[in-house]
Amino acid sequence: MLFRSRTIPMLPERLSNKLCSLRQDEEKLCFSVIFELNEKADILASRIVRTAIRSNRRFTYEEAQDIIETGKGDFREEVLALNELAKLLRNKRFEDGAIDFDRYEVKFEINEKGKPLSVYFKESKESNHLIEEFMLLANRNVAEAIGKTIKGKSKKTFVYRIHEQPDPDKMQNFAEFIGRFGYKLKTTGSKGEITKSINALLDKAKGKPEQNLIETLAVRSMQKAKYSTHNIGHYGLSFPFYTHFTSPIRRYPDIDRKSVV
């Protein structure tokens, strides 16, 4: 549970922050999703394996962002290469019909007594997108590895993270509301046409006084993502297969996926 001034972990602190956490210069046993990508971020090969990992460096998002912006720092070549691949993966997602709900995060400045001093908006930067894209890639790959039926073998029962198509009535109401601000939204047609229209709307609203309102209502016009053993794909991400796998310390369903893998 995440509060303004503290975090209550799902697992005991000895597990979540020490034994199960990838701490610098400590060897940890892991499930790893390993990819071979070319310079265009095409997946040439992938595998899910048990590994032992020793982390050479633990970065904060701010430290990684500084390397991306300045080109200087520890493991600069690795960080910059990963960032270039992440940008390609991100562009491909949107080309395939993913929706760009990249909203500002509300943050609080807290004093030592837990009293909020100020509130501010935190914008996602390239370092955030870098982690996000490889997290999505791993989650998608695990879902595909389990969910795709292999000839001659029975389909395995698996829990997917699914996201249905938006309700037409909600979309129409949303389109009528934003029309008051002079915006237009396509609510009928192919999935690609609708998601392209949504992304164009969100892009046009950026920097405008009504940006936060439109982004909030756009999210509310969507269906809620949920877990299901019946896979229908993930509409918002535009993935035919998707699950939660990468955060077993803070999300119980991810522990369940690892037991299946």
Please report, for each region that a protein language model flagged, where it lies by residue.
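Electropositive polyanion-binding surfaces
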Residues: 1-261
